[in-house]
Amino acid sequence: MAAKNIKYNEDARKKIHKGVKTLAEAVKVTLGPKGRHVVIDKSFGSPQVTKDGVTVAKEIELEDKHENMGAQMVKEVASKTADKAGDGTTTATVLAEAIYSEGLRNVTAGANPMDLKRGIDKAVKVVVDEIKKISKPVQHHKEIAQVATISANNDAEIGNLIAEAMEKVGKNGSITVEEAKGFETVLDVVEGMNFNRGYLSSYFSTNPETQECVLEEALVLIYDKKISGIKDFLPVLQQVAESGRPLLIIAEDIEGEALATLVVNRLRAGFRVCAVKAPGFGDRRKAMLEDIAILTGGQLISEELGMKLENTTLAMLGKAKKVIVSKEDTTIVEGLGSKEDIESRCESIKKQIEDSTSDYDKEKLQERLAKLSGGVAVIRVGAATEIEMKEKKDRVDDAQHATLAAVEEGILPGGGTALVRCIPTLEAFIPILTNEDEQIGARIVLKALSAPLKQIAANAGKEGAIICQQVLSRSSSEGYDALRDAYTDMIEAGILDPTKVTRCALESAASVAGLLLTTEALIADIPEEKSSSAPAMPGAGMDY
Protein backbone atom coordinates (compact mmCIF):
# COMPACT_ATOMS: atom_id res chain seq x y z
CA MET A 1 0.00 0.00 0.00
CA ALA A 2 1.28 3.47 -0.90
CA ALA A 3 2.22 5.85 1.92
CA LYS A 4 -0.41 8.47 2.80
CA ASN A 5 -0.24 12.23 3.25
CA ILE A 6 -2.70 13.33 5.95
CA LYS A 7 -3.92 16.88 6.59
CA TYR A 8 -5.83 17.85 9.76
CA ASN A 9 -8.14 20.61 11.00
CA GLU A 10 -7.26 24.07 9.66
CA ASP A 11 -4.80 22.74 7.06
CA ALA A 12 -7.42 20.30 5.72
CA ARG A 13 -10.12 22.96 5.53
CA LYS A 14 -7.82 25.42 3.73
CA LYS A 15 -6.97 22.80 1.10
CA ILE A 16 -10.65 21.92 0.57
CA HIS A 17 -11.54 25.61 0.29
CA LYS A 18 -8.85 26.22 -2.33
CA GLY A 19 -10.13 23.27 -4.41
CA VAL A 20 -13.77 24.37 -4.08
CA LYS A 21 -12.88 27.95 -5.04
CA THR A 22 -10.75 26.89 -8.04
CA LEU A 23 -13.56 24.80 -9.54
CA ALA A 24 -16.29 27.34 -8.72
CA GLU A 25 -14.34 30.22 -10.33
CA ALA A 26 -14.17 28.30 -13.63
CA VAL A 27 -17.85 27.29 -13.53
CA LYS A 28 -19.58 30.44 -12.31
CA VAL A 29 -18.38 32.66 -15.18
CA THR A 30 -20.93 30.80 -17.36
CA LEU A 31 -23.97 31.85 -15.25
CA GLY A 32 -26.70 34.07 -16.67
CA PRO A 33 -27.50 35.57 -20.08
CA LYS A 34 -24.21 37.49 -20.13
CA GLY A 35 -22.15 34.57 -18.82
CA ARG A 36 -18.91 33.83 -20.66
CA HIS A 37 -17.79 30.76 -22.56
CA VAL A 38 -15.13 28.34 -21.33
CA VAL A 39 -12.78 26.68 -23.85
CA ILE A 40 -11.68 23.15 -22.93
CA ASP A 41 -8.59 21.57 -24.47
CA LYS A 42 -9.09 18.04 -25.80
CA SER A 43 -6.37 15.41 -26.18
CA PHE A 44 -7.64 14.79 -29.72
CA GLY A 45 -9.69 16.94 -32.07
CA SER A 46 -10.49 20.62 -31.73
CA PRO A 47 -11.09 22.36 -28.35
CA GLN A 48 -14.61 22.31 -26.91
CA VAL A 49 -16.41 25.62 -26.37
CA THR A 50 -19.17 25.47 -23.75
CA LYS A 51 -21.37 27.51 -21.46
CA ASP A 52 -22.64 24.43 -19.61
CA GLY A 53 -21.57 24.33 -15.95
CA VAL A 54 -21.44 20.55 -15.53
CA THR A 55 -19.34 20.14 -18.71
CA VAL A 56 -16.77 22.59 -17.31
CA ALA A 57 -16.84 20.94 -13.86
CA LYS A 58 -16.32 17.43 -15.25
CA GLU A 59 -13.11 18.50 -17.01
CA ILE A 60 -11.40 19.79 -13.85
CA GLU A 61 -8.76 17.71 -12.07
CA LEU A 62 -6.30 19.52 -9.77
CA GLU A 63 -2.65 18.57 -9.31
CA ASP A 64 -2.70 18.84 -5.50
CA LYS A 65 -4.58 15.75 -4.26
CA HIS A 66 -6.05 17.42 -1.17
CA GLU A 67 -7.30 20.43 -3.14
CA ASN A 68 -8.65 18.02 -5.75
CA MET A 69 -10.84 16.38 -3.07
CA GLY A 70 -12.64 19.70 -2.53
CA ALA A 71 -13.02 20.21 -6.28
CA GLN A 72 -14.36 16.67 -6.78
CA MET A 73 -16.96 17.13 -4.01
CA VAL A 74 -18.30 20.28 -5.71
CA LYS A 75 -18.19 18.46 -9.04
CA GLU A 76 -20.52 15.96 -7.36
CA VAL A 77 -22.94 18.85 -6.61
CA ALA A 78 -23.06 19.73 -10.32
CA SER A 79 -23.39 16.09 -11.41
CA LYS A 80 -26.15 15.27 -8.90
CA THR A 81 -28.13 18.36 -9.91
CA ALA A 82 -27.72 17.44 -13.58
CA ASP A 83 -28.86 13.85 -12.89
CA LYS A 84 -31.95 14.91 -10.92
CA ALA A 85 -33.06 18.03 -12.79
CA GLY A 86 -30.95 18.09 -15.97
CA ASP A 87 -30.01 21.77 -15.51
CA GLY A 88 -29.05 24.27 -12.78
CA THR A 89 -25.51 22.93 -12.39
CA THR A 90 -23.88 26.37 -12.33
CA THR A 91 -26.41 27.67 -9.79
CA ALA A 92 -25.71 24.61 -7.60
CA THR A 93 -21.94 25.23 -7.79
CA VAL A 94 -22.33 28.92 -6.88
CA LEU A 95 -24.57 28.00 -3.90
CA ALA A 96 -22.16 25.27 -2.71
CA GLU A 97 -19.19 27.66 -2.77
CA ALA A 98 -21.18 30.40 -0.99
CA ILE A 99 -22.39 28.05 1.78
CA TYR A 100 -18.96 26.44 2.28
CA SER A 101 -16.95 29.72 2.24
CA GLU A 102 -19.25 31.40 4.78
CA GLY A 103 -19.45 28.22 6.87
CA LEU A 104 -15.66 27.88 6.93
CA ARG A 105 -15.32 31.43 8.28
CA ASN A 106 -17.63 30.52 11.17
CA VAL A 107 -15.92 27.17 11.89
CA THR A 108 -12.57 29.00 12.03
CA ALA A 109 -14.16 31.48 14.46
CA GLY A 110 -15.10 28.59 16.77
CA ALA A 111 -18.62 27.50 15.72
CA ASN A 112 -19.52 23.81 16.08
CA PRO A 113 -19.54 22.27 12.55
CA MET A 114 -22.22 19.67 13.44
CA ASP A 115 -24.60 22.34 14.75
CA LEU A 116 -23.88 24.48 11.69
CA LYS A 117 -24.83 21.56 9.44
CA ARG A 118 -28.07 21.01 11.37
CA GLY A 119 -28.91 24.72 11.00
CA ILE A 120 -28.12 24.60 7.27
CA ASP A 121 -30.39 21.55 6.78
CA LYS A 122 -33.29 23.16 8.68
CA ALA A 123 -32.93 26.41 6.72
CA VAL A 124 -32.90 24.55 3.38
CA LYS A 125 -36.14 22.78 4.32
CA VAL A 126 -37.81 26.15 5.06
CA VAL A 127 -36.58 27.61 1.75
CA VAL A 128 -37.72 24.55 -0.25
CA ASP A 129 -41.20 24.80 1.31
CA GLU A 130 -41.33 28.51 0.39
CA ILE A 131 -40.16 27.77 -3.19
CA LYS A 132 -43.02 25.28 -3.57
CA LYS A 133 -45.49 27.95 -2.41
CA ILE A 134 -44.18 30.51 -4.94
CA SER A 135 -44.17 27.92 -7.77
CA LYS A 136 -46.79 28.10 -10.55
CA PRO A 137 -47.80 25.18 -12.78
CA VAL A 138 -46.88 25.35 -16.48
CA GLN A 139 -50.10 25.86 -18.42
CA HIS A 140 -49.26 27.19 -21.87
CA HIS A 141 -47.10 26.40 -24.88
CA LYS A 142 -45.64 29.92 -24.47
CA GLU A 143 -44.35 29.20 -20.94
CA ILE A 144 -42.65 25.98 -22.07
CA ALA A 145 -40.96 27.92 -24.89
CA GLN A 146 -39.82 30.61 -22.41
CA VAL A 147 -38.28 28.08 -19.99
CA ALA A 148 -36.45 26.35 -22.87
CA THR A 149 -35.27 29.69 -24.31
CA ILE A 150 -33.76 30.83 -20.98
CA SER A 151 -32.02 27.48 -20.47
CA ALA A 152 -30.67 27.54 -24.05
CA ASN A 153 -28.93 30.85 -23.28
CA ASN A 154 -31.75 33.00 -24.73
CA ASP A 155 -31.92 31.13 -28.05
CA ALA A 156 -35.60 31.53 -29.03
CA GLU A 157 -35.24 29.12 -31.98
CA ILE A 158 -34.28 26.26 -29.63
CA GLY A 159 -36.99 27.29 -27.14
CA ASN A 160 -39.73 27.15 -29.76
CA LEU A 161 -38.53 23.82 -31.20
CA ILE A 162 -38.58 22.17 -27.77
CA ALA A 163 -42.01 23.61 -26.95
CA GLU A 164 -43.31 22.29 -30.28
CA ALA A 165 -41.77 18.86 -29.61
CA MET A 166 -43.32 18.75 -26.11
CA GLU A 167 -46.72 19.70 -27.51
CA LYS A 168 -46.58 16.93 -30.13
CA VAL A 169 -45.32 14.02 -28.00
CA GLY A 170 -46.69 14.99 -24.56
CA LYS A 171 -44.86 14.84 -21.23
CA ASN A 172 -44.41 11.05 -21.41
CA GLY A 173 -43.08 11.26 -24.97
CA SER A 174 -39.40 11.01 -25.79
CA ILE A 175 -37.32 13.90 -27.14
CA THR A 176 -33.87 12.96 -28.43
CA VAL A 177 -31.14 15.29 -29.66
CA GLU A 178 -28.93 14.35 -32.60
CA GLU A 179 -26.39 16.06 -34.85
CA ALA A 180 -27.76 17.17 -38.22
CA LYS A 181 -25.90 16.85 -41.49
CA GLY A 182 -26.78 20.40 -42.63
CA PHE A 183 -26.73 23.92 -41.15
CA GLU A 184 -30.39 24.02 -40.08
CA THR A 185 -31.76 22.84 -36.72
CA VAL A 186 -34.95 20.88 -37.43
CA LEU A 187 -37.60 18.87 -35.57
CA ASP A 188 -38.77 15.44 -36.73
CA VAL A 189 -41.72 13.82 -34.97
CA VAL A 190 -42.43 10.10 -35.29
CA GLU A 191 -46.05 9.47 -34.35
CA GLY A 192 -47.09 6.07 -33.05
CA MET A 193 -44.79 3.26 -31.96
CA ASN A 194 -41.47 3.10 -33.77
CA PHE A 195 -38.76 0.43 -33.43
CA ASN A 196 -35.51 -0.06 -35.28
CA ARG A 197 -36.25 -3.22 -37.25
CA GLY A 198 -36.91 -3.03 -41.00
CA TYR A 199 -38.45 -5.51 -43.46
CA LEU A 200 -36.72 -8.87 -43.97
CA SER A 201 -36.95 -8.65 -47.76
CA SER A 202 -37.06 -5.64 -50.10
CA TYR A 203 -39.79 -7.49 -52.05
CA PHE A 204 -42.23 -6.42 -49.30
CA SER A 205 -41.93 -2.70 -50.23
CA THR A 206 -45.07 -1.18 -51.77
CA ASN A 207 -43.50 2.11 -52.92
CA PRO A 208 -40.50 1.73 -55.28
CA GLU A 209 -39.50 5.40 -54.85
CA THR A 210 -39.33 5.52 -51.05
CA GLN A 211 -38.60 1.78 -50.67
CA GLU A 212 -41.28 1.63 -47.94
CA CYS A 213 -44.03 -0.86 -47.24
CA VAL A 214 -47.24 0.94 -46.23
CA LEU A 215 -50.14 -1.18 -44.93
CA GLU A 216 -53.51 0.50 -44.25
CA GLU A 217 -55.98 -1.02 -41.73
CA ALA A 218 -53.46 -3.78 -41.04
CA LEU A 219 -53.65 -6.89 -38.86
CA VAL A 220 -50.60 -7.58 -36.68
CA LEU A 221 -49.32 -11.07 -35.79
CA ILE A 222 -46.96 -10.99 -32.78
CA TYR A 223 -44.96 -14.19 -32.11
CA ASP A 224 -42.00 -14.64 -29.75
CA LYS A 225 -40.22 -17.51 -31.55
CA LYS A 226 -38.67 -18.13 -34.99
CA ILE A 227 -40.91 -19.04 -37.92
CA SER A 228 -39.11 -21.23 -40.45
CA GLY A 229 -41.60 -23.90 -41.61
CA ILE A 230 -44.90 -23.19 -43.36
CA LYS A 231 -46.99 -25.98 -41.75
CA ASP A 232 -47.80 -24.22 -38.44
CA PHE A 233 -47.96 -20.85 -40.13
CA LEU A 234 -50.45 -21.70 -42.91
CA PRO A 235 -53.78 -21.69 -40.96
CA VAL A 236 -53.45 -18.07 -39.82
CA LEU A 237 -52.23 -16.94 -43.27
CA GLN A 238 -55.32 -18.45 -44.91
CA GLN A 239 -57.63 -16.68 -42.43
CA VAL A 240 -55.94 -13.32 -43.09
CA ALA A 241 -56.05 -13.82 -46.88
CA GLU A 242 -59.80 -14.54 -46.65
CA SER A 243 -60.35 -11.36 -44.60
CA GLY A 244 -58.73 -9.31 -47.39
CA ARG A 245 -56.72 -7.19 -44.93
CA PRO A 246 -52.93 -6.62 -45.03
CA LEU A 247 -50.72 -8.35 -42.43
CA LEU A 248 -47.66 -7.30 -40.46
CA ILE A 249 -45.74 -10.21 -38.90
CA ILE A 250 -43.42 -9.50 -35.95
CA ALA A 251 -41.41 -12.54 -34.80
CA GLU A 252 -37.97 -13.40 -33.41
CA ASP A 253 -37.03 -14.27 -37.00
CA ILE A 254 -38.72 -15.45 -40.20
CA GLU A 255 -36.56 -17.54 -42.48
CA GLY A 256 -36.38 -20.35 -45.00
CA GLU A 257 -39.64 -21.76 -46.34
CA ALA A 258 -41.83 -19.33 -44.35
CA LEU A 259 -40.10 -16.21 -45.73
CA ALA A 260 -40.06 -17.62 -49.28
CA THR A 261 -43.81 -18.36 -49.10
CA LEU A 262 -44.57 -14.79 -47.96
CA VAL A 263 -42.45 -13.26 -50.75
CA VAL A 264 -44.04 -15.48 -53.44
CA ASN A 265 -47.56 -14.64 -52.21
CA ARG A 266 -46.66 -10.95 -52.13
CA LEU A 267 -45.34 -10.97 -55.72
CA ARG A 268 -47.71 -13.39 -57.46
CA ALA A 269 -50.96 -13.26 -55.52
CA GLY A 270 -50.75 -9.60 -54.46
CA PHE A 271 -51.08 -10.59 -50.78
CA ARG A 272 -50.22 -7.41 -48.82
CA VAL A 273 -47.84 -8.67 -46.16
CA CYS A 274 -44.63 -7.59 -44.45
CA ALA A 275 -42.37 -9.47 -42.02
CA VAL A 276 -40.00 -7.86 -39.50
CA LYS A 277 -37.81 -9.11 -36.67
CA ALA A 278 -38.90 -8.39 -33.10
CA PRO A 279 -37.16 -5.40 -31.46
CA GLY A 280 -34.81 -5.71 -28.47
CA PHE A 281 -33.13 -8.74 -26.90
CA GLY A 282 -33.90 -11.21 -24.10
CA ASP A 283 -36.45 -10.14 -21.48
CA ARG A 284 -36.62 -6.65 -22.97
CA ARG A 285 -37.75 -8.15 -26.31
CA LYS A 286 -40.62 -9.98 -24.62
CA ALA A 287 -41.69 -6.79 -22.81
CA MET A 288 -41.62 -4.79 -26.06
CA LEU A 289 -43.68 -7.45 -27.87
CA GLU A 290 -46.24 -7.26 -25.03
CA ASP A 291 -46.27 -3.44 -25.45
CA ILE A 292 -47.02 -3.85 -29.18
CA ALA A 293 -49.76 -6.39 -28.38
CA ILE A 294 -51.43 -3.98 -25.91
CA LEU A 295 -51.07 -1.03 -28.30
CA THR A 296 -52.72 -2.93 -31.17
CA GLY A 297 -55.30 -4.80 -29.06
CA GLY A 298 -53.84 -8.19 -29.98
CA GLN A 299 -52.21 -11.04 -28.08
CA LEU A 300 -48.57 -12.09 -27.89
CA ILE A 301 -48.56 -15.65 -29.26
CA SER A 302 -46.20 -17.35 -26.83
CA GLU A 303 -45.72 -21.05 -26.13
CA GLU A 304 -44.87 -20.10 -22.53
CA LEU A 305 -48.51 -19.00 -22.20
CA GLY A 306 -49.74 -22.27 -23.74
CA MET A 307 -50.47 -20.77 -27.17
CA LYS A 308 -49.42 -22.31 -30.48
CA LEU A 309 -48.97 -20.61 -33.82
CA GLU A 310 -51.15 -23.20 -35.62
CA ASN A 311 -54.10 -22.41 -33.28
CA THR A 312 -53.94 -18.62 -33.84
CA THR A 313 -57.23 -16.99 -34.88
CA LEU A 314 -58.01 -13.56 -36.34
CA ALA A 315 -59.32 -12.45 -32.92
CA MET A 316 -55.80 -12.87 -31.48
CA LEU A 317 -54.22 -10.49 -34.01
CA GLY A 318 -53.64 -6.83 -33.29
CA LYS A 319 -55.04 -4.05 -35.47
CA ALA A 320 -53.56 -0.73 -36.59
CA LYS A 321 -54.82 2.12 -38.77
CA LYS A 322 -51.49 2.26 -40.58
CA VAL A 323 -48.11 0.51 -40.58
CA ILE A 324 -45.03 1.99 -42.29
CA VAL A 325 -41.99 -0.28 -42.69
CA SER A 326 -38.71 0.91 -44.21
CA LYS A 327 -35.37 -0.83 -44.67
CA GLU A 328 -34.32 0.26 -41.16
CA ASP A 329 -37.40 0.72 -38.99
CA THR A 330 -41.09 0.04 -38.42
CA THR A 331 -43.79 2.51 -37.30
CA ILE A 332 -47.23 1.44 -36.07
CA VAL A 333 -49.62 4.41 -36.27
CA GLU A 334 -52.89 4.45 -34.28
CA GLY A 335 -52.92 0.96 -32.81
CA LEU A 336 -56.51 -0.01 -31.98
CA GLY A 337 -55.84 -1.30 -28.46
CA SER A 338 -58.06 -0.45 -25.49
CA LYS A 339 -57.26 2.96 -23.98
CA GLU A 340 -57.63 1.56 -20.45
CA ASP A 341 -55.16 -1.27 -21.17
CA ILE A 342 -52.62 1.16 -22.64
CA GLU A 343 -52.94 3.52 -19.63
CA SER A 344 -52.59 0.59 -17.23
CA ARG A 345 -49.45 -0.57 -19.07
CA CYS A 346 -48.02 2.98 -18.94
CA GLU A 347 -48.62 3.14 -15.16
CA SER A 348 -46.87 -0.22 -14.75
CA ILE A 349 -43.82 1.05 -16.71
CA LYS A 350 -43.76 4.29 -14.65
CA LYS A 351 -43.66 2.18 -11.47
CA GLN A 352 -40.75 0.16 -12.89
CA ILE A 353 -38.90 3.42 -13.68
CA GLU A 354 -39.34 4.57 -10.05
CA ASP A 355 -38.12 1.23 -8.67
CA SER A 356 -35.17 0.80 -11.06
CA THR A 357 -31.68 1.64 -9.79
CA SER A 358 -29.92 1.30 -13.17
CA ASP A 359 -29.67 4.42 -15.37
CA TYR A 360 -29.57 2.21 -18.48
CA ASP A 361 -32.74 0.34 -17.46
CA LYS A 362 -34.48 3.64 -16.65
CA GLU A 363 -33.57 5.02 -20.07
CA LYS A 364 -34.91 1.93 -21.86
CA LEU A 365 -38.12 1.95 -19.78
CA GLN A 366 -38.58 5.66 -20.55
CA GLU A 367 -38.22 4.83 -24.27
CA ARG A 368 -40.92 2.16 -23.98
CA LEU A 369 -43.22 4.56 -22.12
CA ALA A 370 -42.72 7.22 -24.80
CA LYS A 371 -43.49 4.81 -27.62
CA LEU A 372 -46.65 3.58 -25.89
CA SER A 373 -48.05 6.92 -24.78
CA GLY A 374 -46.97 9.78 -26.98
CA GLY A 375 -44.39 9.32 -29.64
CA VAL A 376 -40.79 10.26 -30.30
CA ALA A 377 -39.45 13.67 -31.34
CA VAL A 378 -35.93 14.08 -32.71
CA ILE A 379 -34.27 17.51 -32.70
CA ARG A 380 -31.47 17.51 -35.27
CA VAL A 381 -28.97 20.26 -34.39
CA GLY A 382 -27.23 21.92 -37.34
CA ALA A 383 -24.38 24.44 -37.40
CA ALA A 384 -21.60 25.74 -39.66
CA THR A 385 -18.75 24.04 -37.74
CA GLU A 386 -18.40 20.97 -35.53
CA ILE A 387 -17.36 23.11 -32.52
CA GLU A 388 -20.48 25.28 -32.84
CA MET A 389 -22.66 22.19 -33.30
CA LYS A 390 -21.39 20.58 -30.07
CA GLU A 391 -21.88 23.81 -28.11
CA LYS A 392 -25.40 24.19 -29.51
CA LYS A 393 -26.20 20.53 -28.78
CA ASP A 394 -25.20 21.08 -25.12
CA ARG A 395 -27.64 24.00 -24.92
CA VAL A 396 -30.45 21.98 -26.52
CA ASP A 397 -29.85 19.18 -23.97
CA ASP A 398 -30.03 21.70 -21.10
CA ALA A 399 -33.19 23.28 -22.48
CA GLN A 400 -34.86 19.90 -22.97
CA HIS A 401 -34.18 18.82 -19.37
CA ALA A 402 -35.24 22.20 -17.97
CA THR A 403 -38.53 21.96 -19.87
CA LEU A 404 -39.28 18.48 -18.52
CA ALA A 405 -38.47 19.72 -15.00
CA ALA A 406 -40.82 22.71 -15.45
CA VAL A 407 -43.69 20.49 -16.59
CA GLU A 408 -43.08 18.19 -13.61
CA GLU A 409 -42.94 20.70 -10.71
CA GLY A 410 -43.85 24.11 -12.14
CA ILE A 411 -42.01 27.40 -12.69
CA LEU A 412 -40.56 30.29 -10.65
CA PRO A 413 -39.43 33.85 -11.44
CA GLY A 414 -35.96 33.33 -12.97
CA GLY A 415 -32.60 35.07 -12.77
CA GLY A 416 -32.00 34.10 -9.12
CA THR A 417 -35.13 36.05 -8.07
CA ALA A 418 -37.00 33.11 -6.49
CA LEU A 419 -34.20 32.36 -3.99
CA VAL A 420 -33.93 36.03 -3.00
CA ARG A 421 -37.72 36.10 -2.44
CA CYS A 422 -37.27 33.38 0.22
CA ILE A 423 -34.97 35.60 2.36
CA PRO A 424 -37.79 37.27 4.44
CA THR A 425 -39.35 33.86 5.26
CA LEU A 426 -35.99 32.45 6.39
CA GLU A 427 -35.24 35.60 8.42
CA ALA A 428 -38.53 35.08 10.30
CA PHE A 429 -37.64 31.41 10.95
CA ILE A 430 -34.10 31.90 12.35
CA PRO A 431 -35.13 33.30 15.82
CA ILE A 432 -37.22 30.13 16.39
CA LEU A 433 -33.99 28.06 16.53
CA THR A 434 -32.75 27.76 20.13
CA ASN A 435 -29.15 26.67 19.43
CA GLU A 436 -26.89 29.63 18.61
CA ASP A 437 -24.69 27.70 16.15
CA GLU A 438 -27.79 26.35 14.37
CA GLN A 439 -28.90 29.97 13.96
CA ILE A 440 -25.49 30.75 12.43
CA GLY A 441 -25.96 27.76 10.06
CA ALA A 442 -29.34 29.12 8.96
CA ARG A 443 -27.80 32.59 8.46
CA ILE A 444 -25.16 31.00 6.19
CA VAL A 445 -27.98 29.77 3.93
CA LEU A 446 -29.67 33.19 4.21
CA LYS A 447 -26.53 34.87 2.86
CA ALA A 448 -26.01 32.21 0.15
CA LEU A 449 -29.54 32.69 -1.28
CA SER A 450 -28.47 35.93 -2.96
CA ALA A 451 -25.24 34.43 -4.43
CA PRO A 452 -26.71 33.32 -7.81
CA LEU A 453 -28.34 36.74 -8.42
CA LYS A 454 -25.10 38.53 -7.45
CA GLN A 455 -23.10 36.30 -9.81
CA ILE A 456 -25.53 36.92 -12.71
CA ALA A 457 -25.15 40.67 -12.07
CA ALA A 458 -21.34 40.40 -11.81
CA ASN A 459 -21.17 38.51 -15.13
CA ALA A 460 -23.22 41.37 -16.65
CA GLY A 461 -20.67 43.89 -15.29
CA LYS A 462 -22.84 45.17 -12.42
CA GLU A 463 -22.41 45.35 -8.64
CA GLY A 464 -24.24 42.30 -7.24
CA ALA A 465 -25.02 43.70 -3.76
CA ILE A 466 -26.74 46.80 -5.19
CA ILE A 467 -28.79 44.73 -7.66
CA CYS A 468 -29.84 42.38 -4.83
CA GLN A 469 -31.02 45.29 -2.63
CA GLN A 470 -33.02 46.72 -5.53
CA VAL A 471 -34.73 43.36 -6.19
CA LEU A 472 -35.62 42.92 -2.50
CA SER A 473 -37.25 46.37 -2.42
CA ARG A 474 -39.58 45.51 -5.33
CA SER A 475 -42.73 43.38 -5.66
CA SER A 476 -42.53 39.58 -5.43
CA SER A 477 -42.34 38.67 -9.14
CA GLU A 478 -40.02 41.55 -10.09
CA GLY A 479 -36.35 40.82 -10.66
CA TYR A 480 -33.24 41.87 -12.57
CA ASP A 481 -33.17 41.17 -16.32
CA ALA A 482 -29.41 41.02 -16.95
CA LEU A 483 -29.81 40.74 -20.73
CA ARG A 484 -31.61 44.10 -21.00
CA ASP A 485 -30.11 45.63 -17.81
CA ALA A 486 -33.56 46.44 -16.40
CA TYR A 487 -35.85 45.55 -13.48
CA THR A 488 -38.98 43.82 -14.72
CA ASP A 489 -41.78 41.38 -13.87
CA MET A 490 -39.90 38.11 -14.52
CA ILE A 491 -43.04 36.02 -15.19
CA GLU A 492 -44.39 38.51 -17.75
CA ALA A 493 -40.96 38.90 -19.37
CA GLY A 494 -40.72 35.11 -19.73
CA ILE A 495 -37.60 34.84 -17.54
CA LEU A 496 -38.49 31.60 -15.77
CA ASP A 497 -36.70 28.85 -13.86
CA PRO A 498 -38.13 25.36 -13.33
CA THR A 499 -38.99 24.78 -9.65
CA LYS A 500 -37.32 21.36 -9.70
CA VAL A 501 -34.03 22.83 -10.96
CA THR A 502 -33.89 25.51 -8.24
CA ARG A 503 -34.90 23.02 -5.52
CA CYS A 504 -32.36 20.37 -6.57
CA ALA A 505 -29.57 22.96 -6.91
CA LEU A 506 -30.11 24.21 -3.34
CA GLU A 507 -30.52 20.73 -1.81
CA SER A 508 -27.43 19.29 -3.55
CA ALA A 509 -25.30 22.35 -2.71
CA ALA A 510 -26.30 22.35 0.98
CA SER A 511 -25.77 18.59 1.29
CA VAL A 512 -22.18 18.61 -0.02
CA ALA A 513 -21.21 21.93 1.62
CA GLY A 514 -22.47 20.56 4.96
CA LEU A 515 -20.34 17.43 4.57
CA LEU A 516 -17.25 19.50 3.72
CA LEU A 517 -17.77 21.74 6.79
CA THR A 518 -17.79 18.70 9.08
CA THR A 519 -14.55 17.32 7.57
CA GLU A 520 -11.57 17.29 9.97
CA ALA A 521 -9.00 15.19 8.10
CA LEU A 522 -7.94 14.48 4.50
CA ILE A 523 -6.01 11.36 3.47
CA ALA A 524 -4.30 11.12 0.07
CA ASP A 525 -1.60 8.95 -1.50
CA ILE A 526 1.90 10.42 -1.56
CA PRO A 527 2.81 10.58 -5.26
CA GLU A 528 5.75 8.38 -6.19
CA GLU A 529 8.79 10.26 -7.41
CA LYS A 530 9.55 9.44 -11.01
CA SER A 531 13.12 8.59 -11.86
CA SER A 532 14.56 11.22 -14.20
CA SER A 533 17.37 9.05 -15.56
CA ALA A 534 16.81 7.19 -18.83
CA PRO A 535 16.82 3.36 -18.66
CA ALA A 536 20.09 1.67 -19.54
CA MET A 537 20.43 0.27 -23.04
CA PRO A 538 20.52 -3.55 -23.31
CA GLY A 539 24.07 -4.76 -22.95
CA ALA A 540 25.35 -1.43 -21.59
CA GLY A 541 28.47 -1.72 -19.46
CA MET A 542 29.32 -5.19 -20.74
CA ASP A 543 32.75 -5.81 -22.19
CA TYR A 544 32.74 -7.84 -25.39
UniProtKB/Swiss-Prot annotation:
Compartments where found: Cytoplasm
Annotated GO CC locations: cytoplasm
Domain of life: Bacteria
Residues reported in the UniProt entry to bind ATP: 30-33, 51, 87-91, 415, 481-483, 497
GO biological process terms on file: protein refolding
Major location category of this protein: cytoplasm
Induction: By stress.
Reactions accelerated catalytically: ATP + H2O + a folded polypeptide = ADP + phosphate + an unfolded polypeptide
MF (Gene Ontology): ATP binding; ATP-dependent protein folding chaperone; isomerase activity; unfolded protein binding
UniProt keyword annotations, A-Z: ATP-binding, Chaperone, Cytoplasm, Isomerase, Nucleotide-binding, Stress response
Enzyme Commission numbers on file: 5.6.1.7
PANTHER family: 60 KDA HEAT SHOCK PROTEIN, MITOCHONDRIAL
Family: Belongs to the chaperonin (HSP60) family.
Role of this protein: Together with its co-chaperonin GroES, plays an essential role in assisting protein folding. The GroEL-GroES system forms a nano-cage that allows encapsulation of the non-native substrate proteins and provides a physical environment optimized to promote and accelerate protein folding.
Self-association and partners: Forms a cylinder of 14 subunits composed of two heptameric rings stacked back-to-back. Interacts with the co-chaperonin GroES.
UniProt protein name: Chaperonin GroEL 1
Taxonomic lineage: Bacteria, Pseudomonadati, Chlamydiota, Chlamydiia, Chlamydiales
Name of encoding gene: groEL1
